[in-house]
């Protein structure tokens, strides 16, 4: 799943400015609004705590991953202001909720001794996938002559496919420790909270 996020997000990010200007006739104002809308789900990511009352973390992660993929997949089909705003919010909800859950899941499933090494590998897989995705986008445009719609669809579809494969292959990991279902804030972590909020 670590490689699935960059397939969609790197595709969306790499193509966004050119797509917005060339196809949706965006100006600086619309780009500013789009970027603001993209960050709203990030501010609301604490809402994951409430979803935990309804769904397991693994289910939330898979749904979020699929939502990220769907948002990216349909972006190219909506080359207008409202279409790009809506697809961006869909993609962003998936991205931010997945990122919120994946760290928690990783720390639950990994042994404490191996967690730093494995988390480093997970980040490396994501970075490598981003680089490969950027290369594939370049090949798709320059060598294959594909357009925005097809490239967005391929990037998003790859993420959705990975989410579906993970849902079928790993239906339910055992939960060793029961997860808290309430928001816990500790005064001593104020700096971490502030930096996370500002990021």
Language model feature labels by segment:
Residues 22, 46-54, 131-151:
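Transmembrane alpha-helix termini and helix-breaking/packing motifs in multi-pass membrane transporters
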Residues 3, 71, 82-98, 197:
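Hydrophobic core of transmembrane alpha-helices in multi-pass small-molecule transporters
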Residues 137-141, 156-175:
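C-terminal membrane-cytosol helix-exit motif in multi-pass small-molecule transporters
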Residues 16, 97-110:
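Intracellular juxtamembrane helix-capping segments at the cytosolic ends
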Residues 28-29, 112-122:
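Loop-to-transmembrane helix entry/capping segments in MFS-fold secondary transporters
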Residues 66-79:
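C-terminal ends and interior cores of transmembrane alpha-helices
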Residues 117-136:
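Glycine-rich segments within core transmembrane alpha-helices of 12-TM secondary carriers
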């Amino acid at each position: 799943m670590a490689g699935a996020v960059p397939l969609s997000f790197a595709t969306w990010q790499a193509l966004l400015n050119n797509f917005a200007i060339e196809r949706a006739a965006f100006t600086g104002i619309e780009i500013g609004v789009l970027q603001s809308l993209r960050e709203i789900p990030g501010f609301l990511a604490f809402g994951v705590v409430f979803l935990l009352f309804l769904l397991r973390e693994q289910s939330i992660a898979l749904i979020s991953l699929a939502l990220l993929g769907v948002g990216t997949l349909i972006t190219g089909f909506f080359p207008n202001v409202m279409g790009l705003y809506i697809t961006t919010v869909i993609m962003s909800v998936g991205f931010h909720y997945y990122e919120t859950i994946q760290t928690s899941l990783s720390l639950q499933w990994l042994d404490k001794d191996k967690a730093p090494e494995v988390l480093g590998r997970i980040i490396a897989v994501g970075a490598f996938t981003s680089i490969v995705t950027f290369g594939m986008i370049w090949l798709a445009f320059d060598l294959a002559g594909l357009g925005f719609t097809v490239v967005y669809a391929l990037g998003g579809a790859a993420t959705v496919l990975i989410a579906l494969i993970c849902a079928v292959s790993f239906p339910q990991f055992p939960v060793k420790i029961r997860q808290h279902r309430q928001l816990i804030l500790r005064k001593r972590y104020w700096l971490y909270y502030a930096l996370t909020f500002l990021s």
